[in-house]
Amino acid sequence: LYESERQQVLLGDDIDFMTDYMKLEKLCNPEFNFEVNILNEVRYIQVPPLLFMPVIEYVIRTTVCGENGKGENIRIDFQMEENQLRFICTYCLRKKESLQVAPAFDKLRQRLDLLYPGGYQLKSGYNDEALCTIGLMLEL
């Protein structure tokens, strides 16, 4: 949290913070499961602090367990391709009606507009099984 006062932090530090946050959630809800995948070497990329936390917080509030209460609730992928950082979060919705733009996403879009004017894409969607994906692509 001390690093949130800085303009930029290492993505690896932010990933560690998100992982700790989800581990804390798992202590409160033992059926909650998550997976974080880091493709390519993204840990040393500089990003604004806590940039991805609004997505994580929203997803934790809206997920359900896999079949029979077991399985992965959230999967997070970080990948660098050329000069584009990709953050993809996949999770199950409680119900399809839950897929609404959260107020936190409005604030996230405002922040992204200031930090990456015209240099980002924030998308979300779901399939028939209520599996939802939120993707954030940043031009670095």
Question: What are these model-predicted stretches?
Answer:
Residues 1-123, 132:
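Two-component histidine phosphotransfer core
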Residues 91, 135-140:
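C-terminal beta-strand of the catalytic ATP-binding
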Residues 126-128:
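A short beta-turn/loop motif at secondary-structure boundaries
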